[in-house]
Amino acid sequence: MCIRDSIYLAGGFQPILNEEEPIVPTDVLVFDPATFTWQQETVLPPFKDGANRTLTGGCAVTFQTDKILFMGGVNYDCFLAAIARPIHLAKAEAARDSAAITRLEAEAKAYMHHPVEWYRFNTTLLQYDLSTKAWSDLGEYEQLARAGAGAVIQDGRLTIINGELKPGIRTPQVNQAKL
């Protein structure tokens, strides 16, 4: 997303690399084209229970002249456990830890078969104010619990387009909300 001649990035992930644990980001980065550098703009606010939040798989739109609305995306804990499972399984196999191997193989086999609610995709509409560097929680909306959705603001309405309800299952739904 480009605002005020800067590019903002939230989400993504780093897969297992050279036997290192994967990384799921919990921050927003800003790229300054004048200096060709990335810097941390802000850390995402944690959930009310203190759990980490990520915008991996989420989407964002500019709002007014100096705000960004962030929505959707995967649950940090569920996603990190899934993408880290191969390295944990390899370590369990190297240690000949049969209990861990059995558990991790069962988790991998079951991962795509859980009900939608199990994945806990993000339902919070977050607003980040670039002027004050402050986050606002604009509420919980089940329609935002998507990964890979598109979003657009037009005529004072936020439109959320499609997205995954859970891994591998996309919805054709288009939802709108008046801002």
Indicate residue ranges for each PLM-predicted region:
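Kelch-like beta-propeller repeat domains
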Residues: 1-179
